[in-house]
Amino acid sequence: MSEVNVPLSFSDAAAKRVKALIAEEENPSLMLRVYITGGGCSGFQYGFTFDETVNEGDTKIENSGVILVVDPMSLQYLIGGVVDYTEGLEGSRFFVNNPNATTTCGCGASFSV
């Protein structure tokens, strides 16, 4: 497990929403895990899930008492990015503002490098 300063940010809006969701689940040991999988219309897609486990090699990023966890394979595609949260006419969602993405699909759920 790594707790070094990494070039990946966890926005205040995302941390606030994660904190609210954790309170709803009544499980303070939950962390938000962001990961990359193959798929989507652009080759890779982002995934978000709650996790209670920090695996060997994972990187932890903290904001306002909330922890974001990223596995080493996913982190290489997220360097310089920002994990954020938005609410709007299209609904609410977590997303990644990723400077490494050379193309993204229209909804922003998948990307290529």
UniProtKB/Swiss-Prot annotation:
Homodimer. It comes from the Bacteria. One of its GO terms (cellular component) is cytosol. The gene is erpA. One of its GO terms (biological process) is iron-sulfur cluster assembly. Keywords: Iron, Iron-sulfur, Metal-binding. It comes from Vibrio cholerae serotype O1 (strain ATCC 39315 / El Tor Inaba N16961). PROSITE patterns: HESB (PS01152). This is Iron-sulfur cluster insertion protein ErpA. GO terms for molecular function: 2 iron, 2 sulfur cluster binding; 4 iron, 4 sulfur cluster binding; iron ion binding. Required for insertion of 4Fe-4S clusters for at least IspG. Belongs to the HesB/IscA family. Pfam families: Fe-S_biosyn. InterPro entries: FeS_biogenesis (IPR000361), FeS_cluster_insertion (IPR016092), FeS_cluster_insertion_CS (IPR017870), FeS_cluster_insertion_RrpA (IPR023063), HesB-like_dom_sf (IPR035903). Iron-sulfur cluster binds at residues 41, 105, 107. Its cofactor is iron-sulfur cluster. Binds 1 iron-sulfur cluster per subunit.
